[in-house]
Amino acid sequence: MAFSLEEAAGRIKDCWDNQEVPALSTCSNANIFRRINAILDDSLDFSKVCTTPINRGIHDQLPDFQDSEETVTSRMLFPTSAQESPRGLPDANGLCLGLQSLSLTGWDRPWSTQDSDSSAQSSTQSVLSMLQNPLGNVLGKAPLSFLSLDPLGSDLDKFPAPSVRGSRLDTRPILDSRSSSPSDSDTSGFSSGSDHLSDLISSLRISPPLPFLSMTGNGPRDPLKMGVGSRMDQEQAALAAVAPSPTSAPKRWPGASVWPSWDLLGAPKDPFSIEREARLHRQAAAVNEATCTWSGQLPPRNYKNPIYSCKVFLGGVPWDITEAGLVNTFRVFGSLSVEWPGKDGKHPRCPPKGNMPKGYVYLVFELEKSVRALLQACSHDPLSPDGLSEYYFKMSSRRMRCKEVQVIPWVLADSNFVWSPSQRLDPSRTVFVGALHGMLNAEALAAILNDLFGGVVYAGIDTDKHKYPIGSGRVTFNNQRSYLKAVTAAFVEIKTTKFTKKVQIDPYLEDSLCLICSSQPGPFFCRDQVCFKYFCRSCWHWRHSMEGLRHHSPLMRNQKN
């Protein structure tokens, strides 16, 4: 049913040149409207369709576009007799292809209440939803929204000009809707499965000719840009023509602006998306590149009568090991329990699914002397390059004999390191360091960050209830410059002879009020230096809905239950 480009250009020329032929009958849309009316069982009233010839003066003012490329790529405007098309954009009635003359109830009062004539309005909604005209959506179920992603299915590709396909926007409805779902409009009026009806709709010319639009600007406009943007210009002009004043928008228009949701398009749909983003940021070291690298040997460790945590790490355990096997092997050193690795410490006493260990496990003894006894039974090399004593214990399982596993204890003195005891520790100059390696103690962490940024006065390793490290720490600087350098670095790669690990640096967070409203708690922190403050939920959404700030990632304190 689609027309060729040459035929479309010829029909446009006929519409302007022939004064004796009625507008509706000469345009290619006339037969289409009649066939649509036939499908509707002649429910549309064509008695008031205007047949007055078009004013000749308009044609004289238009440029000759018989051989113009703009003519070939344009679609016809349907003028009515009640108006002489102005030299600018067409008004709302002109854009509606003469539908006002089809006696469509409620056309002249799109903001009427819901208790208007429902039967006539249903007929109007059906036709207008087929045309996908922005004014049709005023009466439909998604007022003043742009075209949906696939309003006519695959038949959308049959439109002759690229401007229709180029103007498809994935936006939410601008204003409130009578329907709980925009998809409800797809089932009203006609069945979307009618191929014949789709062919009719795909053949409609619903945009004004490009030469007609070209006269609206102060200077010449690029035909290519006009081909893409003509649909947007048309919709904006139509909305401006029908939009009521701010004082006359009582029910369907909650705000004075015609486009109230443009400012809300960037807002997250889920109000709890901030928490999800904050949780994802905690694992950012796994997916981000390091901005700087430290390589070298860790400072030697010299202990005199060290005190150990009652919890030890076992690495490289046999894959078929069971909890009973672990208890039977290590209970000779004292009473103990087994903690299997679990997500965020959940169900730590339960083995993984399928009873398949991840290759490591934690042993928790009741007494610290049990750990000493275990280490004495291990083989170790005290002369390692980094000054670290590595402990290995031989154990067996049902299918593996004499497997050597690594035992990593934790000395309580390694949890804190103070470089300057007289220096006051300022939380506002403290950074949080995540994704630490298990062999990294506070002294080594302080030395690494002092080499990179300078000014370190304190370093601490975060521990659990058994005083065993949990993989994070804190470092305090004595000046703001070093602190900001560390925060800006964000990701640092640490290379030693024993391991290579990428750590993550963030500002250390405290309990604080929102620094915008100063009335609500501020659990969310923006680490970008444009913001760099605490926010409550409402102030976060308000601040970060602005252009250029939407990419900021939130931080939250990792509060354990």
Swiss-Prot record:
InterPro entries: CEBP1_N, CEBP_ZZ, CEBP_ZZ_sf, CPEB, CPEB1_RRM1, Nucleotide-bd_a/b_plait_sf, RBD_domain_sf, RRM_dom. The modification Phosphoserine is found at residue 43. Expressed in hippocampus, cerebral cortex and oocytes (at protein level). Expressed in brain, heart, kidney, lung and ovary and testis. Weakly expressed in granular cells of dentate gyrus and the pyramidal cells of CA3 and CA1 of the hippocampus. GO terms for cellular component: cytoplasm; glutamatergic synapse; meiotic spindle; membrane; nucleus; P-body; postsynaptic density; ribonucleoprotein complex. Changing residue 171 to A: Inhibits CPE-containing cytoplasmic polyadenylation and translation activation. Residues 159-194 are annotated as: Disordered. Zn(2+) 1 binds at residues 514, 517, 536, 539. It is found in: Cytoplasm; Synapse; Cytoplasm, P-body; Cytoplasmic granule. Residues 329-561 are annotated as: Necessary for stress granule assembly and correct localization in dcp1 bodies. Residues 310-407, 429-510 form the RRM domain. The modification Phosphothreonine is found at residue 171. Residues 176-194 have a biased composition (Low complexity). GO terms for biological process: cellular response to amino acid stimulus; cellular response to hypoxia; cellular response to insulin stimulus; mRNA processing; negative regulation of cytoplasmic translation; regulation of mRNA 3'-end processing; regulation of neuronal synaptic plasticity; regulation of translation. GO terms for molecular function: metal ion binding; mRNA 3'-UTR AU-rich region binding; mRNA binding; mRNA regulatory element binding translation repressor activity; RNA binding. Phosphorylated on serine/threonine residues by AURKA within positions 165 and 196. Phosphorylation and dephosphorylation on Thr-171 regulates cytoplasmic polyadenylation and translation of CPE-containing mRNAs. Phosphorylation on Thr-171 by AURKA in embryonic ovaries at 16.5 dpc (mostly pachytene oocytes) activates CPEB1. Not phosphorylated on Thr-171 in embryonic ovaries between 18.5 dpc (diplotene oocytes) and metaphase I. Dephosphorylation on Thr-171 by PP1 in embryonic ovaries at 18.5 dpc (mostly diplotene oocytes) inactivates CPEB1. Interacts with kinesin, dynein, APLP1, APLP2, TENT2/GLD2 and APP. Both phosphorylated and non phosphorylated forms interact with APLP1. Interacts with TENT4B; the interaction is required for TENT4B-mediated translational control. Belongs to the RRM CPEB family. Sequence-specific RNA-binding protein that regulates mRNA cytoplasmic polyadenylation and translation initiation during oocyte maturation, early development and at postsynapse sites of neurons. Binds to the cytoplasmic polyadenylation element (CPE), an uridine-rich sequence element (consensus sequence 5'-UUUUUAU-3') within the 3'-UTR of mRNAs. In absence of phosphorylation and in association with TACC3 is also involved as a repressor of translation of CPE-containing mRNA; a repression that is relieved by phosphorylation or degradation. This is Cytoplasmic polyadenylation element-binding protein 1. It comes from Mus musculus. The lineage of its organism: Eukaryota, Metazoa, Chordata, Craniata, Vertebrata. The gene is Cpeb1.
